[in-house]
Amino acid sequence: MRFVLKRLALFVVALFGLSVVVFAALRILPGDVASVMAGVNSPPERVTQLREQLGLNRPLIAQYFDWMSALARGDFGTSILTGRSVTSLVGARASITFPLIILGLLIALAIGLPLGCAAVLARSATVRAVFHVLAIVGGAVPALWGGLLLILLFGRGVGLLDVFPSQGFPLDGWGAPGSAISALVLPAVSVGIIVGASLMRYTRAVLGDLASSGYIDMARSCGMTRTQAVLRVGLRLATPQLVSVIGLTFASMVTGVMVIENLFALPGIGNGLVTDVGNRDLIAVQSELFLLAAFFLTVGLVVDLL
């Protein structure tokens, strides 16, 4: 119980610190936000009105506490450019990003865990070297390059095999589940290959250490083969570490798929955040960054408590 309370206290402190960092970082950016949002040829009266609307004419400490009090009420603000609430914007984008990273993570697990186990169990030095090269190449391939290659191979209208949509998301979203899933296949594979290579390296490292430990020797002395001992005993012992890595990987993928979302023209969280930053939509950006930070910290807290 004491550990749980300590972790919760650290979570609150970290969340407060991140809110200060997000708020301060957006205020020290060069250029006047109100002038940029109003437009180049806007009259000074419009800029002044926009500064009052955004609360930029108030002291910084007052602006921060206004923002914090609004967050405490569940009010994440309204985008100046679109007029939509930040909650609805993030919700719409999350309905694309989270299925993408879940599908990508499933592909990564299907690649990383079996290959990591196989790399540990391989007796031939040549086979182990092949697995080592696969892990390095898979992790070194840039997401942009890998995505472009998949589009050229499988993209509908431009690829050799003409199988999956190469860009965009259905206008009716998940109203057409088949089309929505089809649009996520190539992006998810792009993500899955890169993340899968990292999971393969980590699985190989963890199981490799356990394979030479006394636990495996004890299991083998009970009549298990080396393969049985590694897969039954080793994997069970490695599960807490693997769960921690998978959880943190899932959290980091929310913004990590930003390049993939831009490449495949998916209106997800990362793509939307880039657009909002480019448009200097201050209210939307600061709330989106805070929500992303809170999500990452929450996943880290859950992983620690498991």
Predicted stretch roles:
Residues 1-2, 12, 90, 94-127, ...:
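Alpha-helical transmembrane segments of integral membrane proteins
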Residues 29, 138-141, 254:
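Transmembrane helix irregularities
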